[in-house]
């Protein structure tokens, strides 16, 4: 069952930016296809996903959607798609 705050944010996004809404929905579906029992909640203005710990967030901006990884520094990135130069966090712009 989808959390009320998740549903509300999705409705708001669909009303204000349908293109970003479709992209966010595709990313959410991809996440659930890999981690079907992931928990999702609204945090920091986006969608945060967790299992035993938080593993990513999906954020819709005016010009793009960002998939952010709190420990992205630990991810293999053979194709160089991760952005960010901080100590831990990395993101992908879509």
Language model feature labels by segment:
Residues 1-93:
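Charge-dense, helix-prone N-terminal extensions
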